[in-house]
Amino acid sequence: MGSPHREAIRTARSVVVKVGTTALTTPSGVFDAGRLAELADAIESRMKAGTDVVIVSSGAIAAGIEPLGLSRRPKDLATKQAAASVGQVALVNSWSAAFARYGRTVGQVLLTAHDIAMRVQHSNAQRTLDRLRALHAVGIVNENDTVATNEIRFGDNDRLSALVAHLVGADALVLLSDIDGLYDADPGKFQNARFIPEVSGPADLDGVVAGQGSHLGTGGMASKMSSALLAADAGVPVLLAPAADAAAALTDASVGTVFAARSERMSARRFWVRYAAESAGSLTLDEGAVRAVVGHRRSLLPAGITAVAGKFFGGDVVDLCGPDATMVARGVVAYDATELATMMGRSTSELPGELRRPAVHADDLVAV
């Protein structure tokens, strides 16, 4: 009997497909519209079988290198953003032309980490992608490199694809790149590197050494593994497969490494708190509060707080840290930082009536 986790990929009715930069370029780094068209063929076959697909496509910077007369991928931010602004046009035009052969229309959705982090923008992006699918258009998502700052070096869209997968309620995430799957070491450097066909828990990752990205993109194995684990933890199974085998990956999931999803899908709010929202500050907890919050899933009371850091307001997301400064949870705080600074360490009975709510309610708290 085949793997039930691969079966989950194969039978998924809604899939996010992430296409990495190296899947869209020649070995010398030149953007290759022909390779993109081949991937579109494989994706079209899956859609023709009745699956909704959203594409997260890297490659804007790479697509802008040749038109701007650059000899290699730029290193400075301004030139990266200039290349992205030129390359994004070529990238979307190529996807549009590829799917036009099948009578399909594409829609471009450019996001930054900030868009995903802010609840209103997060919801707007979700509605846009849902409406594109309802109108039978193919959503092409990319990071908005022309306005991103440090995000432009952030995972070659690996993390973004995991966030989008949960955002649209996808049944599966397929990561396509030049990587065969997960190994316990770099197979290009170590002949005895062991291929890992399935990851069902932390024990499967013992001894795994993940490398960084290529000169063409920014998403190395570390980024892909982290993003796959993020999606799987949220309840979305993931297949990490080579773009050269896209047809097999999207047809029967017989290639690459599959990451098993947790049995219960994380709610949209808890996912946003845990993974998408930007932290506005932190609270340091004593040992008793850590046990209550993490071990017993109880609300955080002011009495268990020993330090307040950051300028945050009620409704913001903050990190909850143990006495050793290790983050143990994240949550939506009920008070401003200035209020909590006067409340911390005090029992509820000592506080005025209007300040007797938990600092972070259990319903707004997610252990990490």
Swiss-Prot record:
Principal EC category: transferase
Pfam families per UniProt: AA_kinase, PUA
Binding, ATP: K18, S177, D178, T218, G219, G220, M221, A222, S223, K224
Residues forming coiled coils: none
InterPro entries for this protein: AceGlu_kinase-like_sf, Asp/Glu/Uridylate_kinase, G5K_ProB, Glu/AcGlu_kinase, Glu_5kinase, Glu_5kinase/COase_Synthase, Glutamate_5-kinase_CS, PUA
Subcellular location: Cytoplasm
Record has Kinase as a keyword: yes
Enzyme Commission number: 2.7.2.11
Pathway as given in its UniProt record: Amino-acid biosynthesis; L-proline biosynthesis; L-glutamate 5-semialdehyde from L-glutamate: step 1/2
Function: Catalyzes the transfer of a phosphate group to glutamate to form L-glutamate 5-phosphate.
PANTHER family: GLUTAMATE 5-KINASE, ISOPENTENYL PHOSPHATE KINASE
Name of the protein described by the UniProt record: Glutamate 5-kinase
Taxonomy of the source species: Bacteria, Bacillati, Actinomycetota, Actinomycetes, Mycobacteriales
Gene that specifies this protein: proB
